[in-house]
C-alpha cells in the first residue's frame, strides 16, 4: 500500500517541477526573491518560537 501511494506523489511532483522549470526561465529573479523572503520570514518565526522557550527554561 505504501509504495502505491508514493508512486503518484512522485509523478505529480515531477509534473510540477517541469512546469516550474518553464516558468522559471521567464522569471527566475521572482522565484529567487520569493525564496529569500520566505527564508527571512522562516527565520523570524523560528526566533519567535525559540525565544519564549528559552525564557521558560
UniProtKB/Swiss-Prot annotation:
Pfam families: PB1-F2. It comes from the Viruses. Belongs to the influenza viruses PB1-F2 family. It is found in: Host nucleus; Host cytoplasm, Host cytosol. Residues 20-34 have a biased composition (Basic and acidic residues). One of its GO terms (biological process) is symbiont-mediated suppression of host cytoplasmic pattern recognition receptor signaling pathway via inhibition of MAVS activity. Keywords: Host cytoplasm, Host nucleus. May play an important role in promoting lung pathology in both primary viral infection and secondary bacterial infection. Residues 1-36 are annotated as: Disordered. Residues 1-19 have a biased composition (Polar residues). Its main location: host cell. Is not encoded in all strains, and seems to be dispensable for replication. This is Protein PB1-F2. GO terms for cellular component: host cell cytosol; host cell nucleus; membrane.
Amino acid at each position: 500500500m505504501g509504495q502505491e501511494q508514493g508512486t503518484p506523489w512522485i509523478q505529480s511532483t515531477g509534473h510540477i517541477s517541469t512546469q516550474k522549470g518553464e516558468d522559471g526561465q521567464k522569471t527566475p529573479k521572482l522565484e529567487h526573491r520569493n525564496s529569500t523572503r520566505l527564508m527571512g520570514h522562516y527565520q523570524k518565526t523560528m526566533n519567535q518560537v525559540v525565544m519564549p522557550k528559552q525564557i521558560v527554561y
